[in-house]
């Protein structure tokens, strides 16, 4: 069984460039076994062979492998710190901001960023790049259609100003859409941005091995300009941030030295 799974992850890496060894094995293996059994394959070899001949199966695998749990203003108090403290600090240094929402899932995070940033400066003076490994999820983010539940933390004035309701949910405004550029990107394999003022990567690194986390912290640090800030999730505190050329600014916010 172990050899079967190890063979599978090697084949996936060769075919897609995605290294499943960098994810926590217990969680990833459980997720993939459930998907394989759902499609009635007895082992990973037969499942991989089927995937190579069926794009639908491969896309389903990629979607299942990624973590697509998101909502607007998730962990609201942290976003308040970004709004009230971090962004004013960044704007003391420059008047145009380059922002990267890494592993953006269905788009709630970059649209949250746009709603906050427009309070401080015209959106034409902001570059927001939003990336994810999952093409289907990015397409969903570009459409910008959301359920009532995912909007529950949005302040009323922002909800009324930037969303249009229909019978089943809400469409995000064109103003916010135009402020965000979506792009496919693999955190574990692709080249990172440079000279970012703010990088947001939240509730993603918990799924990676410690080795992968260390590599990503180094790469995020290199992607920031001096004085730029990395904003991580509420379970992702960086211990020994100085190893990565970072210092704690506020809780879960790290400034590049």
Swiss-Prot record:
The keyword S-adenosyl-L-methionine applies. It comes from the Bacteria. It catalyses: L-glutamyl-[protein] + S-adenosyl-L-methionine = [protein]-L-glutamate 5-O-methyl ester + S-adenosyl-L-homocysteine. InterPro entries: Bact_Chemotaxis_MeTrfase, CheR_C, CheR_MeTrfase, CheR_N, CheR_N_sf, SAM-dependent_MTases_sf. The keyword Thylakoid does not apply. Coiled coil: none annotated. Keywords: Methyltransferase, S-adenosyl-L-methionine, Transferase. GO terms for molecular function: protein-glutamate O-methyltransferase activity. S-adenosyl-L-methionine binds at residues 68, 70, 74, 109, 132, 186-187, 202-203. One of its GO terms (biological process) is methylation. Residues 1-257 form the CheR-type methyltransferase domain. Methylation of the membrane-bound methyl-accepting chemotaxis proteins (MCP) to form gamma-glutamyl methyl ester residues in MCP. This is Chemotaxis protein methyltransferase. It comes from Halalkalibacterium halodurans (strain ATCC BAA-125 / DSM 18197 / FERM 7344 / JCM 9153 / C-125). The gene is cheR.
């Amino acid at each position: 069984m172990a050899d079967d799974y190890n063979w599978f992850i090697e084949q996936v890496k060769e075919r897609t460039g995605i290294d499943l060894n960098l994810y926590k094995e217990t969680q990833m293996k459980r997720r993939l076994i459930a998907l394989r059994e759902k499609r009635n394959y007895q082992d990973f070899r037969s499942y991989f062979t089927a995937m190579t001949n069926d794009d639908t199966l491969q896309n389903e695998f990629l979607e299942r492998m990624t973590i697509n749990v998101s909502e607007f203003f998730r962990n609201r108090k942290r976003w308040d710190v970004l709004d009230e403290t971090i962004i004013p600090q960044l704007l003391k240094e420059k008047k145009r901001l380059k922002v990267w929402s890494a592993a953006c899932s269905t788009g709630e995070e970059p649209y949250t960023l746009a709603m906050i940033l427009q309070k401080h400066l015209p959106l034409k003076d902001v570059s927001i790049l939003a990336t994810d490994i999952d093409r289907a999820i990015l397409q969903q983010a570009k459409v910008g259609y959301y359920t009532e539940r995912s909007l529950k933390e949005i302040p009323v004035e922002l909800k009324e100003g930037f969303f249009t309701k229909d019978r089943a949910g809400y469409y995000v405004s064109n103003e916010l859409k135009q402020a965000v550029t979506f792009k496919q990107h693999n955190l574990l394999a692709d080249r990172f941005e440079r000279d970012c003022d703010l990088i947001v990567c939240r509730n993603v690194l918990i799924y990676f091995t410690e080795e992968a986390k260390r590599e990503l912290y180094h790469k995020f640090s290199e992607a920031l300009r001096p004085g730029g800030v990395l904003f991580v999730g509420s379970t992702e505190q960086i211990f020994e941030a100085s190893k990565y050329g970072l210092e704690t600014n506020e809780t879960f916010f790290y400034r590049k030295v």
